Regions:
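Phosphodiester-processing cores and adjacent nucleic acid-binding clamps
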Residues: 1-110
Length: 110
């Protein structure tokens, strides 16, 4: 039995986590394999848009004889109330529109 401690990443964001992730799922998987991991969890923010990439690339590696196990995941969020969340989101959207309108009506002096 080996004394080597195995590591598996259980929290990774790809390009499908806007503003927070880098690389496509297959890039993450290749990096994991190159660094001795035999599994990796892809946990993008609120979506599983990278799932097909993850599945196809994992199957490709398995056909090549690599023992890699994809872990399918998602980073989810808990909210107290859908109604309250909708109100807060509407207020944020309203403020964004008002701010954009102000910016468009502002004169720029150089």
């Amino acid at each position: 039995m080996s004394n080597q401690i195995k590591f598996v990443g259980l929290h990774a964001h790809s390009v499908f986590s806007v503003f927070d992730g880098l690389g496509y799922p297959q890039d993450h998987i290749d990096y994991a394999v190159e660094n001795g991991m035999d599994a990796l969890a892809l946990t993008d923010h609120g979506n599983m848009n990278g799932l097909a990439y993850q599945v196809l690339h994992s199957k490709k590696l398995q056909k090549e004889g690599k023992d890699f196990k994809p872990i399918y995941g998602i980073e989810g969020y808990f909210i107290d109330s859908v109604a309250k969340w909708k109100e807060e989101k509407a207020e944020i959207d309203k403020n964004k529109k008002g701010r954009k309108k102000k910016e468009l009506n502002s004169a720029v002096v150089i």
